[in-house]
Amino acid sequence: MTTVNLAAYRFVSLDSIEQWRPLVAARCNTLGLRGTILLAPEGINLFIAGPREATDAFVDYIRHDPLFEGKFADLPFKESLSDSQPFRRMLVRLKREIITMKKPAIKPELGRAPSVDARTLKAWLDQGHDDASRPVVMLDTRNAFEVDVGTFDRALDYRIDKFSEFPAVIEANRADLEGKTIVSFCTGGIRCEKAAIHMKDVGIENVYQLEGGILKYFEEVGGAHYHGDCFVFDYRTALNPQLAPTADVTCFACRAVVPADAQQSPLYVPGKCCPACHPGDSGTPGRRAEPGAEPARAV
């Protein structure tokens, strides 16, 4: 049976998340959905999967149920299909932030960061500058192991291990951004939106976020100006520019991304180890995920 995978987020001030949590969990369980929904004072971040009938019912629920006071009435969802259920269980969690930066929570009511859509960005990259003739710099806001799976051509990559390091590396590298148009990007939009808001707040000019992230870019224009695939935080591991799962897998032991060629190594033992963590091996490391990372933890 085909499984529908949905991802969505929104920065919006929420005051009733403690009340919502058990009700949302009960509805998801009744529908037979699996995945993770994060609720925080600054908004919602969700990754869920299930049969088409169940996901359609959830979208109708989150957009129209009076419980949510219309806060998600026009919430956009990103959809992809898979042959199996990528999640093991259904979780609804309360968090301080929907994506952890360890800075004061953003104030959604003050407005979101400026954005650029996929087609406009492709046009900028095709011509080598934006509509004001400023050079365009692509800024990858993801963790280093995600970047290693694929990223935009010539993107800035500061090799962060977790998103909470982002403010410090931006402060240390402001000179890279001066006089340019900065387009922050991530998997699905949430990190690059928060990153763009932070840069705007600290006085960096001409900052945009890529609307909908890499996955929306793939959906709209394919893989133009992008090399590799896109890491995703579920059991598909990575998607190609056609939004199809790749042959990459995640090592059971160390969470490294193991591409197809590395799976042929005698050091790769499914469910046990890979070339990045095989005992006593000092060969080519895999693309290691953050220790303890969970599927559906961030986009």
Curated annotation (Swiss-Prot):
SUPFAM superfamilies: Rhodanese/Cell cycle control phosphatase (SSF52821). The keyword Oxidoreductase applies. Gene3D superfamilies: 3.30.70.100, Rhodanese-like domain. It catalyses: uridine(34) in tRNA + AH2 + O2 = 5-hydroxyuridine(34) in tRNA + A + H2O. It comes from the Bacteria. GO terms for molecular function: oxidoreductase activity, acting on paired donors, with incorporation or reduction of molecular oxygen. It holds the Pfam family UPF0176_N. Catalyzes oxygen-dependent 5-hydroxyuridine (ho5U) modification at position 34 in tRNAs. This is tRNA uridine(34) hydroxylase. It comes from Burkholderia pseudomallei (strain K96243).
